[in-house]
Every structure is written in structure tokens, then in C-alpha cells.
Amino acid sequence: MIQIVTVRSGDSVYSLASKYGSTPDEIVKDNGLNPAETLVVGQALIVNTKGNNYYVQPGDSLYRISQTYNVPLASLAKVNNLSLKSILHVGQQLYVPKGTKRAVESIAYLQPSTIPIKESLVNATRAINPFLTYLAYFSFEAKRDGTLKEPTETAKIANIATQGKTIPMLVITNIENGNFSADLTSVILRDATIQNKFITNILQTAQKYGMRDIHFDFESVAPEDREAYNRFLRNVKTRLPSGYTLSTTLVPKTSSNQKGKFFEAHDYKAQGQIVDFVVNMTYDWGWQGGPPMAISPIGPVKEVLQYAKSQMPPQKIMMGQNLYGFDWKLPFKQGNPPAKAISSVAAVALARKYNVPIRYDFTAQAPHFNYFDENGVQHEVWFEDSRSVQSKFNLMKEQGIGGISYWKIGLPFPQNWRLLVENFTITKKG
């Protein structure tokens, strides 16, 4: 069975393999490690242990372990001769019976930054294809005349998806001149002729490439266009061919009357009734232009999911999950250069380079560390690791959420994909 282990001083791949009954090669592969590099104190690794033995880690509880392994809490306590309120001790050995995995859907977004698409990004897409229900190609940009600006090499990306029995998603955005545009959206929503032409172009494009989900990521929509957006989605839904689905992106809200231009036009209840599923952007509490903090802290993520559940069936909700972290320069000041995006693998490499331990915030359920660079400038890094994504998987189970959506492909995080299939059965529809 797979378990998450936190590296302590003196640990090595070989010592951990010996302790947990795994092999060095397996630990290296599952965690995307370079065998020549040392481990970092505080680094989280996934280790395939012998049989059904589990060794308690910092922050563990019977409830958390039962969630992780899909085993009823009472059964876990009984088989280990423990009460439901037993205090666990780090290193304590437990027996964990085999659990039952729930089926979920998964999405990953692909956003090429070059023409042609870098081969490394194409290879990364192929590598995670087995873990996906949908591949979201970001993005087809809406135009004021009802046409679409198409991204590069669409046919190639759609073929990669279908070869892996993954459904390619046609992601349409209201991006104009590099930004989400309320004015552009208003033109499409308020002019019936342009809107009908727009929908026709979308459906023709979807059928041309075999993109069987039509997805609208319309952000910064004017609050006064809320009902017009709902009507537009109903219009699209009535024109969908058989076998096609409709989905949308929702900004993270915690109430129906939440104010602000980013929130008001996204009607959770109406969209939950109209579309087949929604992608909830449950990330970016820590963002490039803000102060250092966890990108997707577990508490705020849970609040958004609970509100979403009150407005629509939980099976329609896809929880957003970042594959990136950020590296901020300190002290933080408004107007500073934006924080640098960083992958999980690159974050651990930074901690190794500057010989600093990785800490873990159990409240936010997120890893972080600080370091001084060669110029004496202090940095603060928040990112994702196996512990943080496992906490999100447990939240999905607790809330009965229908799936998960990743932003974005090209940020290496091998632990995530191994843990995803350890926790869930991924639905394939292609």
C-alpha cells in the first residue's frame, strides 16, 4: 500500500526503502527523484509499503487515515484494537484493511505558450492521459463578430486525447488583448445575431475536432449580464448534438450575494441546473500579486465546496487544484514584481539548493519554506506536495465531490498522479 512519509534528518532513499519494505528504484520513480541528489528534511515522499501495514506520520488521526484509504473509521479502529478517540503516536504501526475506491472524473488544462507546442509539453500531456477523463485545451478566444480565435495545433492535441480514451474539451474564453473582457462578453450576450453565429461556430469547431465537451470560461462578466449569461448557456444547451456535454468555470464563491465584479455574474444555482458539470477555481488565495500564503488552503476550499453543494448536486462539481506554487521575494509590498510560478519538483530542488528544511502548515495543509538567494534577498515559497493533495482528495471524499480539475499541464508533480489513482477510480468516457 502507498503511504506518505516525511523525510527526517539522516534519511535516504535506501534507508526509507529498507524501513518501509519498498525498493529504492520504486521510491525514485514514484516521486520523480534524481538518485544522485540528497533528500530534503521535511520533504514528503510516497512509499509503497509491504502488505497493509501503515506507519503513523505527523498530523495523522484515525479519521484522516480512514479517509485516505477508503476504510470505515469504526472498522479501522476495531481491527487495531483502538477506540475512535485513540491518540496516535508517530511511528506507530497500524493494519489498514483494503478499502473501496469511488469513481470520479478528472480534467487537466493544457495552455501552450509557444508555436509550435514544445515537445516536452506534448510528452507531458501524453504521460498523464491515462489519469484523465477530459483534456481541456486552453483556449479558443471569443471574437466580437461571433467567430473564434483558435489555439495552435488543435487537431494534434485532440488526437492525443482521443488516443488515450480521453475527451478533448473545447474551452472558450472571453479573453481579448490578453485579458478577460466584460465588454466583449456583453456584445455576445446582448446581440442575438452575433450570439447565434457564435454558437454555430462553436458547434462546428467541436464536431470538426471531436471535442465532445463545450466549456465556457467566461470571467469578469459584468454583474448586469448575469441573467443574459444564464440565458446564453440555456441557448447553447438546447443546440448541443447528442452525446455532447456543456460545462463552465465558476469563480470561488461562499454565498449567493457575494459582491464584486468577479463574482456576481456567476450564478451557481442556475448554472448547476443548466450545465452538466462545473469547474470550481478553488485556488489562488495565494497569488502572484498578493502576499505569500498557501495557494489553495484547505479551509477556504472547503467553504467554497460547501456553498457549491448547497446550489447544485455535488456530483456536478469539479474541484480546482493547482499544480503550481509561487516563490515570493520578501518583504512583500504592493506593486512588487509578481511572484514566480514554480512546480512541486522545482520547489523541492530550491530547498535542496539552499539547504533549508521544508515546513508544513497543518491548518492550511500546505508545505512552505524560506531561503536567502545569492544576493541576500529573502524568499518565501508555498507549493503542493503529496500531503497537501491527499488532504484535498480526502475533502473530495468527505463532500462527495464529482471530480477534480488541474491547472495546468507542464508543471511536474508525479506524486499527484500516483496518489490520484490510489484514492479513486478515474472514469473514462472516450
Swiss-Prot record:
Broadest EC class assigned to this enzyme: hydrolase
Gene3D superfamilies linked to this entry: 3.10.50.10, Glycosidases, LysM domain
Function: N-acetylglucosaminidase involved in cortex peptidoglycan degradation during germination. Cleaves only partially degraded spore peptidoglycans. Recognizes muramic acid delta-lactam residues specific to spore peptidoglycans.
Similarity comment text for this entry: Belongs to the glycosyl hydrolase 18 family. Chitinase class II subfamily.
Summary of pH dependence: Optimum pH is 6.0.
A biological process term (GO) from this entry: carbohydrate metabolic process
Compartments it resides in: Spore cortex
The keyword Repeat is assigned to this record: yes
Protein name: Cortical fragment-lytic enzyme
Keyword Repeat: yes
